[in-house]
Amino acid sequence: MKRVILSLMAMVVAASMMAQVRPQNNHTVSTTLGAGLEYGFEWAFAGQASVVARVGMVSKDFILRSGWDNFQWSATMSPGVTLEPRYYLLMNWRDRRGKYTEGNSAEFFGVPTTMTFGKDGIGELAVSPVLGVRRAFARHWFHEFSAGADLLCMPEFVATPRVCYRIGYLF
């Protein structure tokens, strides 16, 4: 009987160690540093991959100016739609080490494609390959930081650096 119990315990431990953690489907309401408010849905599929779709008011430009005697900032928003394929890089590694992976807390590589619409009706299409870190906390909250390049494809091609900090609510 002792051998049976020990072998069952060994099988349970081995199964839990070999378990694959997958990203989770979730709905979010989030804002970026500066301006914007978006509703998003993350659909998990195929192992560590997911697709994030967001719609809402998107932060288009966030400009900081600083001088000897003043500090100014400006931000503009416009309606927009974002579709972002994501690949979570270290989710299994984090799970094997007992780290928190709830709410898709892991490092990721993503390619957000954003279409924004200005007041003159002319749209802008931006494709932005980014590396990021997402962490969930307090069960329903998350924050993520990503950096990469903004490749503005429409109306003309322009490449600029991209840094984004997002905080939001998971439900």
Residue spans for each PLM region:
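Bacterial Sec-dependent N-terminal signal peptides
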Residues: 1-25, 167, 171
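Short glycine/proline- and aromatic-enriched beta-strand/turn motifs that initiate or cap beta-hairpins
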Residues: 19-70, 112, 117-122
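Short loop/turn motifs that connect adjacent beta-strands in outer-membrane beta-barrel proteins
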Residues: 20-25, 48, 90-107, 137-142
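Residues that define the transmembrane beta-barrel architecture of outer-membrane proteins
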Residues: 23-37, 47, 75-81, 107, ...
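Membrane-embedded beta-strands of outer-membrane beta-barrel proteins
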Residues: 39, 83, 129-131, 147, ...
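Outer-membrane beta-barrel strand-turn architecture
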Residues: 43-47, 89-91, 117-119, 135-141, ...
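Outer-membrane beta-barrel translocator domains and adjoining extracellular loop/strand segments
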Residues: 64-69, 98, 122-123, 155-161
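Outer-membrane beta-barrel "beta-signal"
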Residues: 79-95, 159-171
